[in-house]
Amino acid sequence: MSQTESTKGVKITNYAAIKNAPLPADGPGAKNFSNWLLLGLLTGVPLFVTRKFHGGLKTFIFFFILFAIPILMAYWTVLSSYSPRLNEKVQFPNRGVEHYLKFHDDQLAARYQGQNKIPMETFHELYFEGKVSFKGDALDALEYRHDWASFRFTLSLFRFFLLGMIPEVIMHSRSQDEEQVRDHYDRGDDFYSWFLGDRMVYTSGLISDVNKDESLEELQDNKLKTVCEKIQLKEGEYLLDLGCGWGTLAAFASSQYGAKVTGITLGKNQTKYGNDKIASFGVDEKQSRILCHDYRDTPLPKDENGNTTKYDKITCLEMAEHVGVRKFRSFLQQVYDMLDDDGVFFLQYAGLRKSWQYEDLIWGLFMNKYIFPGADASTPLDFVVSALEATGFETVSIDNIGVHYSATLYRWYKNWLSNRDNVVNKYGIKWFKIWEYFLASSTIISRQGSATCYQIVLRKNLNSYDRAGYISTQEGLQGPISRKTDWVK
């Protein structure tokens, strides 16, 4: 089969670099969702009841508050249950639920069979509890999820959104951030090494050749070099890496480019691991170091004379999502204030598509509940760019690397499966299943555009900035220019 083969108008790919989709189907979503109708119901129902009771403004406000949540829940439930698919180019095999899943409860088996599909949120909760299993590989079954699962909103989904996620969005205190990050990242370095591999990088790598099956280490090395080249990192420059993880970028930039790097993380295990990694490359701690700090306490660097200065370059790879929507602008302002006026800010940001499908939202709530609690700032691109520009940054370039993330996640998934016994023996079967589902579903989600990742290069929007000096880093322009042919005879 060729790299892409058309089946009823839909391309079925066969690239070596990624996990190719056998059933790239679209579901229902934003195209059939009317905010105006929802607003009409939210105001119309309490207004109707108010008039029946011959009440005034206070009565209307009372009924508005009383009915708001039930109306929202009913509206989302009905639309997620009965809205038509975005398109029906891809036909489902209609094999029945029992072809893909094995229930370990007779009542559940009787309830979900044939074309009576199980809600995806219900499924993954039952899967983690051991009440249902995949018949075969998890990722293979999830590729055909439209054939056995629905994306209807459930009561437990609403409960988590209202009582779990919303309070976290509102609060996002220092203590909350510290508790969530340390609970997640200090679980144990071995836990993460069992899927991240030797590089210990928990962010997307980059594909260099879509027709080549590169290793996870090659993908991550491609990314490390790309980051340093995009910011034109030079020897002796002060680099700040916010959310540095296990310090791999800090070690790379220090040893390969001679930069003076400060890495910031809330993870205690990550701090020790990162400093040990930097030292293993023969880099003195006076040159580069990892600090266990809240990002709000990031220190400015000091020059050779002991004077406080600013950072020449700042990188932030998939950490900004943890800041929270409410704190996002203040976070960017802090970055702006710490960056030299001639400096460069590199932001790698995991975002969501604006034209969402219900599947996307259910996956996002799963991620917030089980994988990245408090990471509510994953948003569509326009929110990020608007916030950056309002802070005073100017965009140099934006690259969408969502499919690169899918390739990275697929390799993490295979690593995780190969370490099943290690995980189960130390952390239990439930943790194995949660991460198995996370890595498998995310491989699909990032490949199909539900969630994606952007590399954004930024500078301060000042009149004095040397914009011409960064033309050579704009590969999206330089690549096509270098391949052009003369057309004038």
Curated annotation (Swiss-Prot):
GO molecular function: methyltransferase activity
Name by which UniProt lists this protein: Sphingolipid C9-methyltransferase
Source species of the chain: Komagataella phaffii (strain GS115 / ATCC 20864)
Pfam families: CMAS
UniProt keyword annotation of S-adenosyl-L-methionine present: yes
Any one annotated GO CC term: membrane
GO terms under biological process: methylation; sphingolipid metabolic process
Effect of disrupting the coding gene: Produces only non-methylated glucosylceramides. Shows no alteration of growth and no increase in the level of resistance to plant defensins MsDef1 and RsAFP2.
Topology in the lipid bilayer: Multi-pass membrane protein
This protein's pathway: Lipid metabolism; sphingolipid metabolism
Record-listed S-adenosyl-L-methionine binding positions: 202-203, 239-247, 265-270, 295-296
